[in-house]
């Protein structure tokens, strides 16, 4: 469950390390975001000499949350951290690699490129 002012780790090699959520997209006054939701965030920590710099405003899709995700089968899944992958306006990832597991819900929300780059899909 990600809201305004939430910090997230970055799960790709775009150059950003930490994000601060500015806005959860979708709906007029949407308060919380979960796995598969697109957010607007600012980069709080970045690797030097990379395309993404500190204080850049970026779009990202949430790939892991500490809040448990309830599935229709009755199973729930949760992760150790809150993490996101940076995307461009078309929804394609900015990085070429994705680190750590991602949730299967991303496939349902048409982020198949991120799912294919991930080492593990839970």
Curated annotation (Swiss-Prot):
SUPFAM superfamilies: Ribosomal protein L14
CC per GO annotation: cytosolic large ribosomal subunit
Record GO terms (molecular function): large ribosomal subunit rRNA binding; structural constituent of ribosome
The keyword Lyase is annotated on this UniProt entry: no
Top-level division of the source organism's lineage: Bacteria
GO biological process: one example: translation
Keywords, comma-separated and alphabetical: Ribonucleoprotein, Ribosomal protein, RNA-binding, rRNA-binding
UniProt similarity note: Belongs to the universal ribosomal protein uL14 family.
Function: Binds to 23S rRNA. Forms part of two intersubunit bridges in the 70S ribosome.
Subunit structure of this chain's protein: Part of the 50S ribosomal subunit. Forms a cluster with proteins L3 and L19. In the 70S ribosome, L14 and L19 interact and together make contacts with the 16S rRNA in bridges B5 and B8.
HAMAP family for this protein: Ribosomal_uL14
Name of this chain's protein: Large ribosomal subunit protein uL14
Source organism: Cyanothece sp. (strain PCC 7425 / ATCC 29141)
Lineage: Bacteria, Bacillati, Cyanobacteriota, Cyanophyceae, Gomontiellales
